[in-house]
Amino acid sequence: MSIARLLPRLISAAVTLLGVMVIVFVLVRVVPGDPIAMMISPGASPADIAALRAHYGLDLPLYQQFAVWFWQVLHGSFGTSISLKQNVLTVILQRLPATLELAFFALGLAVVWGTFIALLSTAWRGTMLEKLIDNFNGLMLAVPDFIWGLTFVLLLGVLLPVLPVSGRSDPAIDAKLFTQFYIVEGLLRGHFYFVWDVLKHMILPALTMSFPLAAVIGRVLKNAMMDVMVQDYILLARIKGLSNLRILLQEALRNAAVPALALTGVQFTFLIGGTVITERIFSYPGIGNLAIYAVINRDLPLIQGLVLTFGTFFILVNMAVDAMTAWLNPRLRHA
């Protein structure tokens, strides 16, 4: 991607982030509730309450509060969590690896499953199997994530307890890791039993998150492949004697991958946002669960930091998808 093409996107990203900061700052202060009231003891004096509000800068006018927060963000700090008494950025970075590993695992499942059902539906187009796949796709899209999650908990965690339904790993396993990237560091250090335990804890929440995304990928990829299958070069490939499987994989799938890739990148950002409910259901210690904790405790700095993190991630993923799409499509690459 050229500098001339990249610069407007960077400016647009900066303006978008500024807008996100303003909106979240206003919204968290419009919602009823006082974070200080949730911290103080019933017998606290008005002087103690005033001192606590001054400590967190909540006694300042709103424009000054925003200016302080904006200045902190520019210097790489999101402030101090009111409820946890820790640096907000530190708290987020401790939880972010768990969510990223879960999201990438769910994305991998969605891509594999979505591609499989798209290939199967395209290969058997016009048959009863295609109708069954389309109906199942509609079911995966229609049922909310939390219903899938509760169903998995009931079936595979209670009735047939074959998989763990809460947490990120077995507390009895001490892998002595230095980072929160359990899978990556576990593989690098050869702790394969620990990695397998982490994956087992991720299967149910990842399945819950991947179902709607797999349905979307499968539907878009199938439609794109159907358009490709009527092109002249597909007919030429058939005349040359290429098998249907080879035509599907080498011609149809490859040429239909660009729109599916762009959609996958956009949906991945919503996948990160969808971790809020899923992590709560499975007691998974990621930033989704942290977001609910922040809202319940009216932790304004933590809420602001989390929303800004989500916004930044959304922008970065979309820029990465644009760059990858341009790389795969020469017409966009030289635009």
PLM-predicted stretches and their roles:
Residues 2-5, 17-20, 96-129, 176-335:
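Alpha-helical transmembrane segments of integral membrane proteins
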Residues 17-67, 156-194:
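Hydrophobic alpha-helical transmembrane segments of membrane transport/permease proteins
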